[in-house]
């Protein structure tokens, strides 16, 4: 039955009805507002999975993109690493596994939208974060709005655009959005300058993004680019080597984004909250219908890399728990970093791994070749257990995304917990404004409808079974439950004629609703 559902998923994903193999007769309109993305006015809850095309042999792209699609991924994200394509100044390589255009054509064939993370700085555990060594000899400050560095960035973007031209969303192509730089903490004007360069060259996409962490020194004007967030179950970059160090445990508790773990950085909405505070005072940009930015992620840890000094071993439950918690906390786009591992390409002058002997991003020593990341799909496309455990969640997001997207999160249990806190069950509710009754929202969702999210899991801690738990949403009390240790679930309330269920919705096909 699950195989039938997955086959059906691949045929019906709303985001993927754009292409017929050639330019689409009518390209769907993509907009955003304070809640979600909208495709032709319909709310969607996409699943974005990161794969680095230049870390995978070109002949394997089609097979691996299909696997991602079958896992429920509806948007591909990929970095364009500058030093993978211009390791030597002026010599651009778009051959073999570096051929961005060929990769985009594969995604178009598989009807998978693509978010390009353009750099110039990417990180991705690549040497110098992707910036070629020769750039460090130019005598300019990197990642700032000075003419020299912006001139280099423009040359890079022009080269990338030669690969993208004709494959943008407006052309019926797969490229739906672009991210500028990565994990930037400087002045917002630099990110805006990168966007203006891209627009001048010819980039014309439905939306643009940036990482919402760390906090910028000066803001980006509201509406220019969506801030996207993240969380990780563990991090190779920590200086300590003890298990459970840092604030990663926060990723396993329902909370507003400002309570996010961030792996040493606040990857929640610290910066986004500042943006949203300015929203009411800002002119409404095209595609924005008021309030604030939507809560999206681009770096929800699908696994974790290992460094020489710190080698976290993740469990399949880690990724599933974080994903469910983020969804229950109000996120309407789950973006995994990574969803598919890979292998560093060979360089001409240097190895391409992050290492302490490089002129930039030199805090950690990463493996020379492997970038498996313990992702749902590993370095060679092998499936790890969480590839399968995440699929039902992705099916749910696809089939009930339009119902879920306008629902706000509320938190009956405390948002601030200490590591290993086991005093009470962790749960959250998503409903329309948290109100009871039979009113409907503008999208037609009944205000008496809700989803109850439950997470009784935390990495490194065996949380106890919770007995006689009384869950309630929209005035409807569920029977008292016993929640086993490690249990993670989503219970519907007043959804599709179901008053409530102590089982999780998976999919609906041909008038039938499937639960597990």
Model region roles, listed by residue range:
Residues 109-115, 122-272, 281-306, 328-331:
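Active-site region of glycoside hydrolase catalytic domains
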Residues 47-52, 77-79, 115-119, 179-181, ...:
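A cross-family glycoside hydrolase active-site/sugar-binding cleft signature
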Residues 1-10:
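Bacterial N-terminal signal peptides that target proteins for export
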Residues 53-59, 85-86, 90-95, 184-188, ...:
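Acidic-and-aromatic substrate-binding clefts and catalytic sites of carbohydrate-active enzymes
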Residues 15-23:
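C-terminal segment of classical bacterial N-terminal signal peptides
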Residues 24-75, 105:
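N-terminal carbohydrate-binding accessory modules
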Residues 138, 149-163, 171-179, 188-195, ...:
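Carbohydrate-binding surfaces of carbohydrate-active enzymes
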Residues 61-127, 199:
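Aromatic-lined substrate-binding rim segments of carbohydrate-active enzymes
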């Amino acid at each position: 039955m699950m195989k039938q559902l997955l086959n059906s998923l691949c045929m019906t994903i709303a985001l993927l009805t754009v292409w017929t193999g050639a330019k689409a007769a009518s390209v769907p309109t993509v907009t955003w507002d304070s809640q979600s993305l909208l495709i032709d006015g319909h709310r969607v809850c996409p699943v974005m999975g990161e794969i680095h095309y230049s870390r995978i042999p070109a002949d394997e792209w089609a097979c691996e993109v299909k696997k991602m699609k079958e896992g429920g991924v509806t948007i591909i994200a990929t970095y364009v690493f500058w030093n993978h394509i211009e390791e030597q100044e002026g010599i651009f390589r778009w051959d073999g596994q570096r051929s961005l255009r060929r990769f985009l054509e594969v995604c178009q064939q598989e009807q998978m939208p693509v978010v390009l993370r353009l750099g110039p700085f990417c990180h991705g555990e690549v040497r110098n974060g992707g910036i070629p060594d020769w750039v460090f000899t130019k005598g300019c400050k990197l990642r700032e709005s000075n003419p020299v560095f912006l001139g280099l960035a423009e040359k890079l973007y022009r080269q990338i655009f030669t690969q993208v031209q004709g494959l943008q969303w407006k052309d019926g192509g797969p490229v739906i959005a672009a991210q500028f730089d990565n994990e930037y903490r400087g002045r917002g004007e630099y990110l805006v300058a990168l966007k203006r360069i891209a627009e001048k060259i010819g980039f014309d996409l439905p939306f643009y993004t940036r990482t919402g962490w760390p906090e910028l020194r000066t803001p980006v004007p509201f509406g220019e680019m969506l801030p996207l967030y993240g969380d990780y179950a563990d991090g190779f970059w920590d200086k300590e080597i003890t298990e459970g160090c840092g604030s990663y445990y926060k990723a396993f508790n329902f909370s507003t984004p400002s309570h996010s773990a961030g792996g040493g950085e606040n990857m929640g909405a610290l910066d986004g909250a500042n943006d949203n505070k300015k929203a009411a005072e800002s002119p409404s940009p095209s595609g924005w219908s008021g309030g604030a930015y939507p809560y999206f992620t681009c770096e929800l840890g699908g696994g974790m890399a290992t460094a020489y000094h710190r080698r976290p071993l993740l469990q399949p439950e880690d990724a599933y728990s974080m994903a469910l918690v983020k969804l229950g906390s109000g996120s309407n786009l789950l973006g995994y970093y990574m969803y598919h591992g890979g292998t560093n390409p060979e360089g001409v002058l240097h190895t391409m791994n992050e290492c302490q002997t490089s002129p930039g991003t030199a805090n950690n020593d990463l493996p020379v070749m492997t970038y498996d990341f313990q992702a749902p799909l590993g370095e060679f496309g092998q499936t790890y257990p969480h590839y399968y455990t995440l699929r039902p969640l992705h099916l749910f997001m696809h089939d009930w995304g339009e119902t879920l997207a306008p629902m706000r999160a509320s938190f009956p249990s405390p948002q601030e917990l200490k590591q290993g806190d086991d005093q009470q069950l962790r749960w959250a509710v998503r409903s329309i404004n948290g109100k009871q009754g039979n009113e409907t929202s503008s999208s037609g969702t009944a205000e008496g409808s809700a989803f109850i999210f439950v997470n009784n899991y935390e990495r490194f801690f065996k949380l106890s079974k919770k007995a006689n738990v009384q869950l309630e949403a929209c005035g409807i009390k569920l029977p008292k439950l016993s929640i086993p240790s490690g249990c993670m679930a989503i219970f519907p309330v007043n959804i599709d004629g179901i008053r409530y269920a102590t089982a999780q919705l998976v999919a609906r096909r041909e008038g039938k609703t499937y639960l597990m």
